Amino acid sequence: MGIKGLSQVIADNCPSAVRHNDIKNYFGRKVAIDASMSLYQFLIQVRGQDGQQLMNDQGETTSHLMGMFYRTLRMVDNGLKPCYVFDGKPPTLKSGELAKRASRQQKAREEREEAKEVGTAEMVDKFAKRTVRVTRQHNDEAKKLLELMGIPYVNAPCEAEAQCAALARAGKVYAAASEDMDTMCFQAPILLRHLTFSEQRKEPISEYSFEKTIEGLNFTIEQFVDLCILLGCDYCDPIRGVGPARAVELIRQHGNLDNFVKDADKKKFPIPEDWPYQDARRLFLEAEVQEAKDIELKWRAPDEQGIIKFLVEEKGFNEDRVRVGINRLVKASKTIPQGRLDSFFKVLPSTKKEKEKPKAAAKRKRDTKSSAPKKKR
């Protein structure tokens, strides 16, 4: 679910915290990607001409592998060094949200069957996408493919977004990449959205700065997390009557959720008695992650024959296309730099250069004046 309305809050209160870039701007950057979110995207978006998920002759879904292979190729073609992070066990507090998702999926399955009988193809497709979920098999097959491609991955002990954020905070990667805005609640210094979208969508990558966000809001980290909980997250339902603008106003007025829960008008803001905001706050501020210092990210040369065996022989992919993809992967593995120059050299702010310009111009003027021939009287 992410954080409801957070992108709108940032756009309204601190627009300088987000910028939009082309993928080429991230040449040489290491990025930790939320694998579960990516696989979910692939299962929904990577479809055949009939609108159905891609399958092999055995009836096995292959949309997730097609997406993982070609979207990863697009990244390495542009000089990025991706690593994927997979979800571990969900926190107990998330069980309610997971139960709601399961209920929605069951309802969508029933509506899809009904649409098959009386509805249009568009209706069937709409409800079919709502039934999508990432299974253990999808995860295992994605990990196998990444290993064959030489792309590192990490198994998070709990939430993948939290582990991505931890890797970014430790400097192991430049940014965390996910469509879920709650990645910012885990204090990822930089969040990239739309990184794993297809090239055909021509969607620029949105880069969110955590530091500029809390500076623009004039919030502490704790206040920002409280704001996100108030907006509505996977761990806590939102409070009826509290939208993005009102949530910002309430945190500024009360300072934190403790004061809001204690002092708020309960008729105006019906807060459930068992609203677990303190547990949610703890999950964001003290997330269960593997220590970044214990994680070594290594990008290796691809196992060309292994990829052919897995994708072509086992999963029924077109061999010619896979071989072209392998060639792109091999080329990228030889040309992607170890690091960017701007990570080694300190870039001076442009303001200093601007200040120096008038002085330099004045000096040139004096030099020109002194060297000019004097007029005879």
Swiss-Prot record:
GO biological process entries: base-excision repair; DNA replication, removal of RNA primer; mitochondrial DNA metabolic process; UV-damage excision repair
Annotated binding of DNA, by residue: R47, R71, E159, G232, D234
An annotated Gene Ontology molecular function: DNA binding
Manner of cofactor binding, per the entry note: Binds 2 magnesium ions per subunit. They probably participate in the reaction catalyzed by the enzyme. May bind an additional third magnesium ion after substrate binding.
Keyword terms of this UniProt record: DNA damage, DNA repair, DNA replication, Endonuclease, Exonuclease, Hydrolase, Magnesium, Metal-binding, Mitochondrion, Nuclease, Nucleus, Phosphoprotein
Subcellular location: Nucleus, Nucleolus; Nucleus, Nucleoplasm; Mitochondrion
Location of region: Interaction with PCNA: 337-345
Annotated spans, I-domain: 123-254
Region (N-domain), start-end ranges: 1-105
Processing and modification events after translation: Phosphorylated. Phosphorylation upon DNA damage induces relocalization to the nuclear plasma.
GO cellular component, one term: nucleoplasm
Ligand binding (Mg(2+) 2): D180, D182, D234
Entry EC number(s): 3.1.-.-
Major localisation: nucleus
Domain of life assignment: Eukaryota
Keyword Chloroplast: no
Basic residues bias spans: 360-377
Binding site for Mg(2+) 1: D34, D87, E159, E161
HAMAP family referenced in this protein's UniProt entry, alphabetically: Fen
Purpose: Structure-specific nuclease with 5'-flap endonuclease and 5'-3' exonuclease activities involved in DNA replication and repair. During DNA replication, cleaves the 5'-overhanging flap structure that is generated by displacement synthesis when DNA polymerase encounters the 5'-end of a downstream Okazaki fragment. It enters the flap from the 5'-end and then tracks to cleave the flap base, leaving a nick for ligation. Also involved in the long patch base excision repair (LP-BER) pathway, by cleaving within the apurinic/apyrimidinic (AP) site-terminated flap.
Complex formation: Interacts with PCNA. Three molecules of rad2 bind to one PCNA trimer with each molecule binding to one PCNA monomer. PCNA stimulates the nuclease activity without altering cleavage specificity.
Name the UniProt record assigns to this protein: Flap endonuclease 1
Record organism: Schizosaccharomyces japonicus (strain yFS275 / FY16936)
Designated gene of the protein: rad2
